């Protein structure tokens, strides 16, 4: 999900780790 001018939150794995880019 690419949102212009906003950060992307990526949910990785069953642990629900959140990576903000």
Curated annotation (Swiss-Prot):
Organism encoding this protein: Artocarpus integer (Jack fruit)
Role summary: D-galactose-specific lectin, binds the T-antigen structure Gal-beta1,3-GalNAc (Thomsen-Friedenreich-antigen-specific lectin). Potent and selective stimulant of distinct T- and B-cell functions. Shows a unique ability to specifically recognize IgA-1 from human serum.
Region annotation (Disordered) ranges: 1-21
Polar residues composition-biased segments: 1-10
Protein name: Agglutinin beta-2 chain
Subunit structure, interactors included: Tetramer of four alpha chains associated with two or four beta chains.
Any one GO MF annotation of this record: IgA binding
Stated family: Belongs to the jacalin lectin family.
UniProt KW keywords: IgA-binding protein, Lectin
């Amino acid at each position: 999900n690419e949102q212009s001018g906003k950060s992307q939150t990526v949910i990785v794995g069953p642990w629900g780790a959140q990576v903000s880019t």
